[in-house]
């Protein structure tokens, strides 16, 4: 089987024997499963795919690697600060001197890796370049800087928020989320006692805002960094909510009085409507009769058609030409 993604195509042409290596933050590419090894990823769908093939999976942000690995390959993410966190985390998790390769696309900023490695005191050499990607090689070392240093705390909407590189809206309040918060009192009334699910929770701002007003909140996100950020945000604001990884409703059970969301529509640099469409189409099954879905989206996105198909009708609660807040109610039967 041939590699599908450009970074994996570059790796495929190497003479390196990657058997039993650790793949870190990899893309979906079936070629990796033919090579073997283990995976360390914050993406729930990546972890699920590797578990389905019986491969070792590390899903924690600070895993304990029980067996040594001959080397690791880090797939450089589009968020540079997140890539730097992975470097710190790998140096903390792996024995000193473990071979570490970094691969990524030029348009994703992989060439900036050289400066990041130099700043950490890690030597580096260029191994190969093709398919508009570059592969670098270095070795892990004991570093003075901890991965914990990547976390950011800031204030917004009367809340204390914890955020991490790679999490949506990192370090600031997104304009769409701000608009959604402004209309939530109209949409939900008094949230006290309501069971509310935040899908695509990011740093947990929606759940925290509802939780401090008495709602029973739960939050899910595909990304382990977002789940960790949400848990920290809940703790910082005294909210007794739950947060866990889930691909939309994949690991959600039970019914809710309301579902709130600022759903993603990008996968890396490409537009991907899949998660938002699933959210809308599957929401009625997760709502009690009379329960409501309240979400914000860029005005150009095709959500009205999906809302009509799933709920029959919907209401626009706010529209500033950039963002729209939609509300749809599950009919009582």
Swiss-Prot record:
Primary localization: cytoplasm
Stretches that traverse the bilayer: none
Subcellular location(s) of the protein: Cytoplasm
InterPro entries named among the record's database cross-references: DNA_methylase_N6_adenine_CS (IPR002052), Mtase_sm_N (IPR013675), rRNA_ssu_MeTfrase_C (IPR023543), RsmC/RlmG (IPR046977), SAM-dependent_MTases_sf (IPR029063), Small_mtfrase_dom (IPR007848)
MF GO annotations: 16S rRNA (guanine(1207)-N(2))-methyltransferase activity; nucleic acid binding
Domain of life: Bacteria
UniProt key word Transferase: yes
Any one cellular-component term (Gene Ontology): cytoplasm
Annotated catalysed reactions: guanosine(1207) in 16S rRNA + S-adenosyl-L-methionine = N(2)-methylguanosine(1207) in 16S rRNA + S-adenosyl-L-homocysteine + H(+)
EC assignment: 2.1.1.172
Keywords: Cytoplasm, Methyltransferase, rRNA processing, S-adenosyl-L-methionine, Transferase
A Pfam entry, by short name: MTS
PANTHER family: RIBOSOMAL RNA SMALL SUBUNIT METHYLTRANSFERASE C
Family the entry assigns: Belongs to the methyltransferase superfamily. RsmC family.
Complex and partners: Monomer.
Function description: Specifically methylates the guanine in position 1207 of 16S rRNA in the 30S particle.
Designated name of the protein: Ribosomal RNA small subunit methyltransferase C
Annotated organism of origin: Chromohalobacter salexigens (strain ATCC BAA-138 / DSM 3043 / CIP 106854 / NCIMB 13768 / 1H11)
High-level lineage: Bacteria, Pseudomonadati, Pseudomonadota, Gammaproteobacteria, Oceanospirillales
């Amino acid at each position: 089987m041939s590699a599908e993604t450009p970074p994996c195509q570059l790796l495929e042409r190497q003479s390196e024997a990657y058997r039993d290596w650790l793949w870190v933050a990899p893309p979906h590419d079936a070629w990796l499963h033919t090579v073997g090894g283990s995976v360390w990823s914050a993406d729930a769908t990546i972890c699920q795919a590797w578990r389905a093939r019986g491969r070792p999976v590390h899903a924690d942000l600070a895993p304990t690697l029980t067996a040594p690995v001959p080397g690791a390959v880090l797939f450089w993410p589009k968020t540079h600060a997140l890539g730097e966190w992975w470097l710190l985390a790998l140096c903390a998790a792996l024995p000193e001197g473990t071979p570490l390769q970094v691969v990524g696309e030029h348009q994703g900023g992989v060439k900036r890796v050289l400066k990041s490695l130099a700043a950490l005191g890690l030597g580096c050499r260029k191994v190969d370049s093709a398919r508009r990607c570059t592969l670098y090689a270095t070795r892990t070392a004991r570093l003075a800087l901890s991965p914990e240093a990547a976390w950011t705390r800031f204030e917004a909407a009367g809340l204390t928020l914890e955020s991490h590189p790679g999490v949506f809206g990192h370090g600031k309040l997104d304009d769409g989320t701000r608009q959604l918060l402004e209309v939530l009192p109209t949409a939900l009334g008094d949230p006290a006692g309501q069971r509310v699910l935040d899908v695509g929770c990011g740093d947990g701002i929606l759940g925290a805002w509802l939780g401090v007003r008495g709602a029973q909140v739960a939050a899910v996100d595909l990304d382990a960094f977002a789940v960790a950020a949400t848990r920290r945000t809940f703790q910082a604001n005294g909210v007794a909510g739950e947060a866990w990884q889930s691909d939309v409703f994949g690991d959600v059970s039970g019914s809710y009085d309301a579902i709130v969301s600022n759903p993603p529509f990008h996968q890396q640099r490409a537009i991907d409507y899949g998660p938002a469409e699933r959210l809308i189409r599957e929401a009625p099954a997760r709502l009690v009769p009379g329960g409501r879905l309240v979400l914000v989206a860029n005005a150009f996105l095709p959500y009205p058609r999906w809302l009509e198909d799933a709920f029959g009708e919907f209401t626009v609660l706010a529209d500033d030409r950039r963002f729209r807040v939609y509300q749809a109610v599950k009919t009582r039967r």
